[in-house]
Regions:
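Hydrophobic alpha-helical membrane segments
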Residues: 1-323
Length: 323
């Protein structure tokens, strides 16, 4: 069953390019926000490890008095707002498009803008679920973990790591249970809390397939992260080479090449991440449909069995009365 779900999901990704068009911009904004968070965390970690607090405070004070401070804050706020809104919009627009493909036997293509506006019918519960589950996302947990280390210091690294490690495992279990929540909102019109409860119930009733799929998705994400890190190291290696060039003209020339390569690699990573997000969403959609269909089949079988048992009981009672 797992293999058929994965194959159907991959077929959907490769056949319908409208899904990639719909998800590219949200994935782009998501990667931008991710890089902002990573840059922030690495910078402050560097400051605390090498005791550069005075230099950092001086640099921050100078930045506050620059002409582009307001523009920088506005840009960060815009990236955050677009990331917060576009990610759930695109995700649930994709679900609507996938369901349309499935209903029409893979023959009816829908344009990206149709999927973009499909989210309107379910925006409030979808957005609520998106925010309720934010505290269980790995990025949020890692960010909070680094914050705790900065606040309490390296002396508390063992207890903090132990507690956050347990919480991370708990978050993985919770995220697995909530994997079907979006589909209950869209297809069964449930509210946010109801969808989370229904998703947990469905996941636990089908724990074997849900667990295997969730573990597979984790491996895919880890592989993507490794590839992204490898590609991100390349521009920094190039910049290190630039530092040894004595001629300013050559430095400018290679700097332009560095920027071009960095942009190309960033777009490639965004495309890779977008495709992975579509595949993951398609996989959970196929799993939801398969689990629902199997439960319906089992329920009908039990009903037929009960009817047959009742029929035999009635005939047996009639025969006994006849004798």
């Amino acid at each position: 069953m797992k293999e058929s779900i994965v194959l159907s999901a991959w077929e959907m990704v490769t056949e319908f390019h409208s899904l990639k068009k719909l998800n590219f911009i949200p994935s782009f904004m998501g990667m931008l926000w991710l890089f902002v968070i990573v840059f922030y965390q690495l910078t402050f970690t560097y400051i605390y490890i090498f005791d550069k607090k005075d230099e950092a405070l001086e640099a921050l004070t100078k930045f506050l008095h620059t002409d582009y401070f307001t523009e920088s804050i506005a840009l960060l706020a815009t990236i955050f707002i677009l990331y917060t809104l576009l990610e759930p919009i695109a995700k649930w627009g994709m679900i609507e498009m996938m369901h349309s493909y499935k209903q029409h036997k893979w023959e009816k293509n829908r344009r990206s803008w149709q999927g973009f506006f499909d989210w309107l019918r379910h925006f409030l519960p979808i957005f609520e679920v998106h925010n309720l589950t934010a505290i269980f996302r790995p990025l949020s947990i890692i960010t909070f973990y680094i914050l705790l280390l900065r606040v309490f210091g390296r002396g508390f690294i063992i207890p903090i790591s132990s507690v956050m490690g347990i919480y991370l495992i708990f978050a993985f279990c919770i995220n697995m249970c909530f994997s079907y929540a979006n589909f209950f909102i869209i297809f069964e019109h449930k509210k946010a809390i109801e969808s989370l409860s229904a998703s947990t119930s469905l996941a636990l009733r089908n724990i074997a397939i849900t667990g295997r799929l969730y573990f597979t998705m984790i491996l895919l994400y880890l592989r993507t992260i490794v590839i992204a890190v490898i590609f991100l190291v390349i521009p920094f290696l190039i910049s290190s080479v630039l530092a040894f060039l004595p001629i300013i003209g050559l430095k400018l020339f290679f700097l332009v090449i560095f920027v071009v390569i960095a942009v190309i690699l960033f777009i490639f990573i965004v495309h890779l991440n977008s495709t992975l997000e579509i595949f993951v969403e398609a996989t959970w959609y196929e799993a939801y449909i398969a689990c629902k269909a199997e439960e319906k089949t089992n329920k009908n079988s039990e009903k037929d069995h009960d009817n047959d048992h009742s029929t035999h009981a009635v005939h047996g009672h009639d025969d006994h009365a006849h004798h």
